[in-house]
Amino acid sequence: GARWEVLVDAHTGDVLAFQDINQYAKRQITGGAYPLTSTEICPVPTQCGIMQSDAPMPFANTGLAAPNNFAGSAGVFEYAGGAATTTLNGRYIRMVDSCGAINASSPTGTIALGGVNGQHDCATPGFGGPGNTAASRSGFYELNKLAEQARGWLPGNAWLNAQMTANMNLNSTCNAFWNGSTVNFYRSGGGCRNTGELAAVFDHEWGHGMDDNDAAGALSNSSEGYADIAAIYRLQASCVGHGFFWTLNDGCGQTADGTGFNVNESETGLHCATDCSGVRDADWAKHSDNAPDTALGYVCTHCSVSTGPCGRQVHCAAAPVRQAAWDLVTRDLTAAPFGYDSQTAFIVGNKLFYQGSGNVGLWHACTCGASSSGCGATNGYMQWLTADDDNGSLADGTPHISAIFALMKLLSRTITADRVSIRAQSAAQVA
């Protein structure tokens, strides 16, 4: 049985601590999960699609009594005996699979959900229930790890500390969505892979949820930019959902690994990614024209009329935002005067993203045929500067102002007055 230790303040008699001091064994819940994509090969880390057989199932339910009813971040929990059971109804993420229920038990406490490379859609290891699919395991791992990262920057956010449902293997193809409360993913077909087996698609749809539940409590415009940043900053890969376009060819040719077709990001012609079969590539240098997509130069000419920035379609019009965010962590913060390594640059980028995007309304202003600017109070550039500030005043610049200027430089070529002011602040700050 339990042995209890009580710590009492000798002066006041107050109980300071009351705890079980037995040393229990530890057990773990693991399962096979696709890392970035589900292409079944791993040519480079940023396009790795081989199932990882023993991925931890973070914060999974255990079927045990509290306080051991949920595993920790590594899928590990304290075990005193009896059967452990998980349904992937976790502390923060709950999986619901259209293929069926998930239910895996172990009399020894250790639960291995299994799964092997090449299993897709409703295929299972033959145990753990018909919902023990690659999509459910991959989604449970990735969504938990992304939300855990976000809690590190926004510990008081109520949505991040509540449970979110992810619906997997829905009977449709070539898409995924956030519906205001849940994230939802489709099985393979129509020339596309299962969107519930692609890490960046998980992260993107979760990003809409974060956008909807941050400080402002409403989606920014374009929320597609926000969601893409969540994905590319988490995975440190510019291609959003490599492997999405499996056999669907938009005229841009096959990727180097031969597992899919490059995405065409233009709505009015061809604007091809050179090695990305996902839905977008945030690195402008990996596009056929090898040039940044600015608001006036690209969005106004390549995107259809709609409700996004510049009055254009929201996914297409988010190109300058996602490219600026990628530039920040891969070019500006790694160059002089900062010279950060990649890991440090992404840490800075994630801080700015999570702590600086909560009150973004319109990421940047833009009127096609006229001008574009990012200097509005609720524009992304100004909000990220505020998050970067270290003394309560933007008048003397911020620690990374010259790098954050990447959020501005891709938006327009017509904001000379603003640029002069910002560059003067930058020079003073980094000198």
Regions found by a protein language model. Name each.
Residues G1-F202, W206-A431:
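Zymogen propeptides/activation segments of proteases
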